[in-house]
Amino acid sequence: ETHANKAAHQVQLKILKTYYEKFGNTIAIGMEMFTRPYQPFLDQWVAGEIDENKFLEETHWDSEWGYDYYLYKDILDFAREKKIPVIALNAPKALVKMVSKNGLKGLSEEEKKQLPEIDTTDNFHRAYLERAIREHMVDRTADLEKYNDVQNLWEEYMAQSIVNYLSSWEGKDKKFLAFAGNGHIIYDFGIPEKVFRRSHLPYYTIYPAEFHGDKPPPEHDLFLPEIPLEPADFVWVIPPLVEQKRIYLGVQLQKKSDNKLVIQEITPKSPAEKAGFLVGDIISSIDGTAVKGVPDLVHYLQKKKFGDTCIVEIERDGTKISYSV
């Protein structure tokens, strides 16, 4: 996938639905977006034991992943509806931070025990990452070793998560759809090769490619002269990312020690300013639903359409006031 492109996620959903129609409950989904410690909450989500707000809160969606949840909502809703297992693939942030800071060679023996088996010797993989640094990170060539280490950590960890599941009693003989960024599957040297090294299971890769017109430009990642490999088994052409307008109140919030959400700043000419909100107001609920954190407010607003209204209850100097916004 291209994380922020809705068209890529529509491709994923289409493939998921087709697989479900053909294979029923013998499929499972793996998602880069979740780190392995949050697996219990994915299980609870699929089982229908927690609602969406609780699910997003417990998996720390906004701080852990950060992309718009509504890009992924249809996939996760379908998994819940059909009881399709969703497997958390990614490495915990603490491990990533540790390797990013010290590199693999700078870790103690105790620290290395927390990691999967990691192979950083693929020269084509390294060439791809070096190009990414050169094109996207100004004057960062000195960080190539650590960047290579972190990328391999992510991919080895996700590969190990996939193999762990497919080797388990519940994952045995299942068809597995792994949803991850294009950079982790292109040319096979990321997740695909690392899964195969561990399991020798057959696989296909599908690369959703963004470009204008009928043909990609020659400098596209799919056609790198320094990497004489097939970029993917299938390339699915999708339209380029289109910036979408977001529904917003127009406030900057801060969560205080007593868990109250206090307005720190109001955007000029925003819905909040027009409604009469003031800096220092405390937002307590929206349409009767308690707002416990910024993610609650953001995700609720994304359910709205342009032209809709909502009732926001605020607290000002000990008095509760309701505004129609």
Language-model features and meaning:
Residues 2-24:
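Zymogen propeptides
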Residues 2-5, 34-38, 92-96, 182-185, ...:
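Solvent-exposed loop/turn segments at secondary-structure junctions
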